[in-house]
Amino acid sequence: MKRKLSVFVSVIFLLVVAVFSLPQGCYAMAKNAEVQVEYLRHRIYARRFIDNYNIHVFQKAHEHAGLTFHRGITVTRPRGYTTEDNIRRDSDAVGLGPACMIRWERPISGKLYGDLEFSGSFLIYSKAFPAQGRPWGFMWRLGPRLTWKYTKNNSFSLGYMFSHSSNGMRTNNPGHHSFGFSIGFNHNF
């Protein structure tokens, strides 16, 4: 267990060093902020009843060939329970971690745009989550979004997201799926 923890801490340290050693131009060019708030309800897994309340804050980092690449942070508050082995176990926690998103956007008409988003977050939880899991994990999201650009610098969006959360390990990996609506606001400076 100590070896796994030391490897985990080493990987996090190397990621932080890599991010902060980037040339300033790489992370100083973003001139916008996007906030997404969502409620995702549990689905698919029969023994995992966990709902997610998420806040994502993104900045556009790069644009290429119709795709935009974003970096940000995710705060999540999953709540619920699991019933593995017919034993009810509470699965409430708070998670925080870095996120990245890829968005493909196409105009529909006038100020209305259609988007397809894929994002991933690496989260550190306040305790082992879900029950019998680990205190860290990943959250993957995919879904369509409609964006209304009501001014040159502001837009409002509504999306429907599918989310998969797990820690990616073969053992102690009680992952769960959820679906739900996401509301977003973007402001360009």
Question: Can you say where each PLM-predicted feature lies in the sequence?
Answer:
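Extracellular loop and loop/strand-boundary signature of outer-membrane beta-barrel proteins
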Residues: 42-43, 84-90, 126-132, 167-172
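Flexible, solvent-exposed coil segments and beta strand-coil junctions
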Residues: 32-39, 79-83, 120-126, 161-166
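Gram-negative (and chloroplast) outer-membrane scaffold detector with strong preference
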Residues: 51-128, 186
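Membrane-embedded beta-strand positions of outer-membrane beta-barrel proteins
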Residues: 33-39, 69-73, 100, 116-120, ...
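Cleavable N-terminal export/targeting peptides
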Residues: 1-30
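Predominantly the C-terminal beta-signal and adjacent terminal strand-loop region
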Residues: 32, 145-189
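Short glycine/proline- and aromatic-enriched beta-strand/turn motifs that initiate or cap beta-hairpins
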Residues: 21-75, 182-189
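Residues that define the transmembrane beta-barrel architecture of outer-membrane proteins
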Residues: 31, 47-53, 92-98, 134-140, ...
